[in-house]
């Protein structure tokens, strides 16, 4: 189960709202055929200068928590358990207060 | 011996699986709804092909958290038999019940065609009794490129956990026969306990004479011959 955000509202606490900006990318050991196809397309368009190209996912999610550290630990948990498959992907994220 | 096939939203091979086991193999088989928490006394659970939850996020990633998966995982951990075919294999991999992961096919295309498989493991229920020849079985998937890191790969090879490898018509395991770009031509694997089987090809779609190919039936029959 994912970690539950404690029932702060019921306790009368004011929650902070964040935007979690999450990137999920294929790990470097894995060949990324999508990235290769995009490079080929750019070459066909005669747009020059690009090197290695890797394609992943970007996920934006709003999250409410008591503070930034709590929000971070919840997003971390979500990434590990569902948003990324750590056998083939890695993730990074940033939190911005909104 | 009672078989059960789990139906997830977006599964589309559950009827083929029921037909193969009931009509071609004469077995008792029931459908299990993914929201239930009851395996209805099934000894052998099958996760069928399809596109559970529309393949959103990653193939099998959401289905892996369907309510019935708690019971399926508990069944597998107790040594009970579980088999995942195509999307079912992806769900098993996401659940960590079999090693490795399934990536987008190397040529990025969805492949629907007959391919050939060479049985590998001599120590699993599913493959030990098969002949040493190429079996013609259909595949239909976009995310079938098997991947495992170096350590895992060594472990599954050393422990005889590879069920099938893609081969050509004469049984030669070669790069040309590796349609989806799987590591070491791997088409199916089992867990360390050898009671959970995952494979991308569809044996249930090659089980009836009317379809002109019963190589799949020979594979599914293994389970019955040993357990019945």
Language model features by range: what are they?
Chain A
Residues 1-2, 28:
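Residue-level detector of alpha-helical hydrophobic segments embedded in or interacting with membranes
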Residues 3-15:
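Short, Lys/Arg-enriched N-terminal segments with co-localized hydrophobic residues
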Residues 12-58, 62-98:
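Long, contiguous binding/interaction regions
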């Amino acid at each position: 189960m994912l970690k539950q955000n404690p029932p702060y509202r019921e306790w009368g606490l004011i929650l902070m709202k964040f935007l979690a900006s999450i990137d999920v990318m294929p790990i470097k050991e894995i060949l990324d055929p999508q990235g290769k196809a995009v490079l080929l397309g750019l070459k066909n368009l005669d747009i020059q200068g690009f090197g290695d190209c890797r394609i992943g996912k970007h996920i934006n999610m709003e999250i409410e928590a008591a503070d930034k550290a709590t929000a971070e630990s919840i997003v971390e948990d979500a990434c590990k358990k569902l948003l990324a498959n750590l056998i083939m992907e890695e993730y990074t994220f940033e939190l911005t207060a909104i | 011996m009672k078989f059960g096939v789990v139906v997830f939203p977006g599964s589309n091979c559950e009827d083929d699986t029921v037909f193969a086991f009931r009509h071609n193999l004469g077995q008792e088989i029931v459908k299990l709804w993914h929201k239930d928490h009851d395996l209805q006394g099934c000894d052998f659970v099958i996760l069928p092909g399809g596109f559970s939850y529309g393949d959103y996020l990653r193939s099998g990633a959401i289905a892996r958290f369907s309510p019935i998966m708690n019971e399926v995982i508990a069944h597998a951990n107790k040594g009970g038999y579980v088999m995942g075919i195509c999307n079912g294999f992806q769900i098993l991999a996401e659940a960590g019940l079999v090693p490795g992961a399934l990536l987008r096919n190397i040529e990025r295309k969805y492949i629907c065609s007959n391919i050939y498989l060479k049985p590998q493991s001599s120590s699993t229920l599913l493959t030990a009794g098969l002949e040493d020849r190429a079996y013609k079985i259909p595949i239909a998937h976009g995310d079938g490129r098997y991947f495992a890191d170096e350590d895992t790969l060594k472990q599954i090879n050393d422990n005889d956990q590879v069920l099938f490898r893609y081969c050509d018509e004469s049984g030669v395991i070669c790069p040309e026969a590796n349609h989806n770009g799987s590591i070491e031509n791997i088409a199916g694997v089992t867990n360390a306990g050898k009671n959970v089987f995952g494979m991308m090809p569809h044996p249930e779609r090659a089980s009836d004479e009317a379809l002109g190919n019963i190589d799949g039936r020979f594979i599914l029959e293994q389970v019955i011959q040993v357990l019945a």
